[in-house]
Amino acid sequence: MVKQRTLNRVVKASGIGLHSGQKVMINFIPHTVDGGIVFRRIDLDPPVDIPANALLIQEAFMCSNLVTGDIKVGTIEHVMSAIAGLGIDNLIVEVSASEVPIMDGSAGPFIYLLMQGGLREQDAPKKFIKILKPVEALIDDKKAIFSPHNGFQLNFTIDFDHPAFAKEYQSATIDFSTETFVYEVSEARTFGFMKDLDYLKANNLALGASLDNAIGVDDTGVVNEEGLRFADEFVRHKILDAVGDLYLLGHQIIAKFDGYKSGHALNNQLLRNVQSDPSNYEIVTFDDEKDCPIPYVSVT
């Protein structure tokens, strides 16, 4: 049986909030069977839990925020991507502020931290959401589409007319597994244009942004001295974001995802469109690991 998984032990770390620029504590806590992914604001008294649910997402500036009432947890997509990449079903993510720390702008540090906690199988079948027919979300020329597929394939295309974005590196395809995610996707960093930074900081946004946690792009190219980690790092990061956004459906998805210039808002709309019609999907489990179309890292 393909089983649900959580962590073996608590892991604690800290980092800088992208928008606040302040230190944020983050703790990963093992959770119970069918508990799902839950974000917990421990800076509040009493602490407030917000489940990682697509219907609780509100888009802020270039990130996904979970919101309940007037309480939010922002910039969740990179840690959600790491959680999905390792196939973790049940986890409590404690944060000491209204946003998850940005770390280095990728999912890599979260992969490292979660692996420090160790993966533990739980005595319950892992649930998957199998897409049964095409579902799409469209905004202007942007699109996000699910199609039936025996696995989880992500195809993404960005479209930037800019010297830093070589045309041959604006599309990428990933057949999702823990191995491909960790080695081909998780280290891809977020990116932004230097010309936007002064405006953002003047409006109390991106106060924690730096070349230590993002790829900076000016009028001619990449500003970071070390350059890119991959020739197609920009589009790989969009795939990273999509993996995190799509995991808000509650379970690993079995489908093909095609994104063209898609972002957090459109990815979320796609999930809402899936949920709007129960005939779009079914919940499946696998009694034999050989039948599972998505390979995960083994739990030892």
Swiss-Prot record:
Organism: Acinetobacter baumannii (strain AYE)
InterPro entries from the UniProt entry: Ribosomal_Su5_D2-typ_SF, UDP-acyl_GlcNac_deAcase, UDP-acyl_GlcNac_deAcase_C, UDP-acyl_N-AcGlcN_deAcase_N
GO molecular function (one): metal ion binding
Residue positions of the active site: H264 (proton donor)
Domain of life: Bacteria
Binding site for Zn(2+): H78, H237, D241
Keyword entries, A-Z: Hydrolase, Lipid A biosynthesis, Lipid biosynthesis, Lipid metabolism, Metal-binding, Zinc
Descriptive protein name: UDP-3-O-acyl-N-acetylglucosamine deacetylase
UniProt family annotation: Belongs to the LpxC family.
